Design a protein with these regions (language model features):
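General small-molecule cofactor/ligand-binding pocket signal
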Residues: 120-123
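Acidic/polar alpha-helix N-cap and adjacent early helical turns
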Residues: 127, 142-179
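AMP-binding/adenylate-forming catalytic core of the ANL superfamily
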Residues: 13, 17-115, 125, 130, ...
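Short, small-residue-biased leader/transition segments that mark boundaries at the very start
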Residues: 2-7
Length: 179
């Protein structure tokens, strides 16, 4: 019974929390005048950089070409009346200023200056669901201060042990009002 309640609550928060009473599934669609539907991409994998929408895949495509990076996850966080892009990466060697500069230059030249992350943190692992999806939205919720049990269903995670690192980063670097 308790498991059923947990599943129901998780289902509700996944699909009905963002727009009260409206099913929100995370895809952008276009409905034509002939009532045809065209899938245009994932809305939950979209960053909002001061009103400019950026697809995370644009940035991941560039990061995948940087040999020092094993894996990455990028989120946007609201800071006063602005937003910042926060990049988490697992690396093959220690993250230093040379790698950070390489990342910023590559993203700027292959995407745009608006795509460049403000903050870059090294983590041992990027969190994934059991089905292999990066957990961008739950990590964004955790970084913004939401409790883990409200942001993530650990049972749906491939690697829940990595969450402590993200909480530590939030508490150490991202908790001040100025961020």
């Amino acid at each position: 019974r308790q498991r059923q309640m947990c599943i129901r609550d998780s289902y509700h928060s996944s699909y009905f929390e963002k727009n009260k009473g409206v099913w929100t599934h995370g895809d952008w669609i276009y409905i034509s005048s002939e009532k045809g539907i065209l899938m245009q991409g994932r809305s939950d994998a979209t960053l909002n950089r001061n009103g400019i929408r950026i697809g995370t895949s644009e940035i991941y495509t560039v990061l995948d070409q940087i040999t020092e990076i094993k894996d990455s996850l990028i989120i946007d966080i609201a800071v006063q009346k602005s937003s910042k892009l926060v990049l988490f990466i697992s690396t093959k060697k220690t993250l230093d200023n040379e790698i950070k500069t390489k990342i910023k230059n590559a993203v700027k030249s292959k995407c745009s200056p608006r795509h460049v992350p403000n903050l870059i943190f090294s983590v041992s692992e990027i969190p994934y669901t059991i089905s292999g999806k990066k957990m961008e939205i739950p990590i964004k919720k955790i970084v913004n201060g939401q409790k883990i049990d409200q942001a993530i269903s650990k049972g749906a995670m491939k690697n829940p042990e990595c969450l402590k690192e993200y909480i530590d980063i939030r508490n150490q670097y991202l908790k001040s009002p100025d961020q």
